[in-house]
Amino acid sequence: NEINKTSESNIGIRVNPNPKIFDKKDIEYVEDGFRFGFSDDNEELERAIKIVQTKSDSVGLHLHCNSITRSKDVYISLAKYAVNVIKKYKLNISYIDMGGGFFGGVPGKTTQAEYINAIKQIFEPIVDVRKTKLYVEPGSAIIGSVVDLVTSVIDVKNTANARIVTTDGSRIHIDPLWIKKGYMYSLETQKETINNRQIICGYT
């Protein structure tokens, strides 16, 4: 029994939130729902909680979701959902993991402090915020705002249609899902001459 091996540990449960708690403009999966975690709509979450409570007096909650807008309202809705779960099952919470998907240093967008303060205000009436740990997973929000990808040209070929410029870096390094439509970039060139059509290709 795996839970016996971890009975001395701080066990966390991944919650599968009902997508209906979010605004449709914020979440892509309103109709299909999320794939990870235990759902409170079909008693799976209740069963998971009961199993954990046989071995531990406290429990952690994981509440990740994917947002297309990175809106602060997404995390407010998620925190309110967590509060309802905590109240419903009378949970003694050791930590709460709100996942990632935050903006990172983008001018005019929600700051890290604003996210955290909004989340804190929801949890403060229900948990001891001095003892209950809050985890966030900013990931790309950290690295995306402080890292530049620097590439150089390694090959140039003239074809019938265009000049093909190959670099030693690739789009996959900064946009592995190939979703982004435009990029902030700067050029360092030896000449200011503007050639006819050029296509910049990543290294593959």
Segment roles from a protein language model:
Residues S71-S77, G105-I116, G144-D155:
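Short glycine/threonine-rich loop-to-helix capping motif typified by GTGT followed
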Residues A118, K133-T204:
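Charged (often Lys/Glu-rich) extended helix/loop segments that serve as interaction or gating elements
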Residues A82-I86, I116-V127:
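Alpha-helix-loop-beta-strand connector modules within alpha/beta enzyme cores
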Residues S9, R130-T132:
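A short helix->loop->beta-strand "cap" motif at the edges of active sites that frequently abuts
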Residues I13, L61, M98, E137, ...:
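Conserved, mostly hydrophobic/aromatic
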Residues H64-N66, I96-V106, V136-A141:
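Glycine-rich beta-strand-to-loop/alpha-helix junction loops that act as flexible
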Residues K87-N92, I126-R130, N158-N161:
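Secondary-structure transition/capping motifs at alpha-helix termini
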Residues N1-Y95:
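Active-site-proximal beta-alpha core segment in soluble small-molecule metabolic enzymes
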